[in-house]
Amino acid sequence: QYLMAMRYGVEFTLGRQAAAEDILALRPDQVILATGSRSGQPPWLDDEWAMSGLIPSAREMAADLLERHDVTEGRAVLVDQDHSEMTYAIAQLLAKRFTAVTIVTSRERIGHDVSLINRQGIYQRLHDLGVEILCNVEPVSLAALEDAQLQLRNVYSGATQMIKNVAAVTHASSRIPNNALQAPLEEAGLEVI
């Protein structure tokens, strides 16, 4: 794609973050805004916990874990609301850095948005690594985290259960587009795609 774009005269400026002024200075006819996304804050994660940084997004945790090679005693809990290949690659990384891993999802299975053949491979790899998978549940309270426990609630029956020996909690949540440039560009009269 890069080579084809170059062939058709697309100019790339890499290694810097563009501001609206940078884009406007180029006097474009249209702007294709492809600025990525960030993880949203799941409903079970209140603002205080979110601001503390103690329950990072799976992307944030993966970046941290890639810098380390030690193994942490205890269970990492990955709350899966994303259901993409990225989530399960991070679960595999967690299995290398923690003595136990549990994936929690409110859906009836993991990998809901992944093709069947890929999902089968994901299940095989996760089970080979001893990853526990809990379906139809979601976190209901973070109050017991100080005691290394996470309370879950069944989304159908309301029955609760505890995960014990919790050393870390992370979430793979819906993504929110990084579209801060959209409004200033549209206000300047540009068509933003």
Q: Where are the predicted features?
A:
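N-terminal Rossmann-like dinucleotide/flavin-binding domain of flavoprotein oxidoreductases
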Residues: 1-25, 114-140
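Rossmann-like dinucleotide/flavin-binding elements
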Residues: 13-26, 31-48, 52-114, 146, ...
